[in-house]
């Protein structure tokens, strides 16, 4: 199954603020990722994979 960042966040019932804090970015950065205005770098992608227990190939960034 493929997941957007919003879907992953919702699976934990987290706000954008909580997700941003858990990843270590500002809420504006997280919001931009969800809206596809910008994309996480490799370090943050690895954190997302670990935090949500999901493979890179299962995350939709486009």
Language model regions located:
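A short, Lys/Arg-rich alpha-helix, primarily the initiator
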Residues: 1-11
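Key DNA-contacting residues within the recognition helix of helix-turn-helix
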Residues: 6, 31-32, 41, 60
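Alpha-helical residues within the helix-turn-helix
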Residues: 10, 21, 50
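Short alpha-helical DNA-recognition segment
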Residues: 13-32
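Short, conserved catalytic or interaction motifs in soluble domains
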Residues: 35
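DNA major-groove recognition helix of helix-turn-helix/homeodomain DNA-binding modules
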Residues: 43-58
